[in-house]
Structure formats: structure tokens, C-alpha cells
Amino acid sequence: MRLERLVETWGTVVVIDATSSGLDEVALVSAVDEVEEFFFQVDRDFSTYKSDSQVSRLRRGEMKIEDATEYVQQVWALCEYARELTLGAFDPWKAEGGFDPSGLVKGWA
């Protein structure tokens, strides 16, 4: 069984193409629904264009990283590691407006 779904998120379209020989249609649709919801949650948490996202709140100093979700904290830590690994060539804290992990998040998600 194969299921393909186009998901509008992150200012683009993501294609979910799921194939399974071991799941029935209901289970496969449910799994794809979960993936789609994860993408929407990533957009809600990480968007620099949504004023109520956790990243936007971090950028404005309205919350501390310790108060963010586990996923946001994981991405923050990955960004710190990537900054160290690239000797500062990748630095989401140098973005205009402050912390912008977009370059890492789309690959991470």
C-alpha cells in the first residue's frame, strides 16, 4: 500500500510518500497523519514569521531556552554544536532579529 500527501508548511510544500506492505490502510493513514501533525508543530514552534512561536519568543527575550519544549531545546543544542563544528560559519544567533535556526530545522525535521 502506498499513500502520498502534499503538506503546505514552512512556507513550502512537503511531500509525504509512505509505502508499507505490513500496515493496513487505516494504520498507514494514521501514521501519515502523525507525520503531518509533527510538521505543523515544528512550524508552530520554530517559525520566525509567527509572533507566538517559541523561536519568536526566544528572539524577543520573552522566554528562556530552559522553558522551551524539548524539541526546541534539542535544536538549540544542535545549533550550538554546528556553530562550534563550523568555527562560526554557521551561527543562527548572528541572524537579523536574533536566533534563527531555520537552516538547521528543515533538515532536522
Residue ranges, per PLM feature:
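A contiguous, well-ordered beta/alpha segment that forms the leading edge of an enzyme domain
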Residues: 1-109
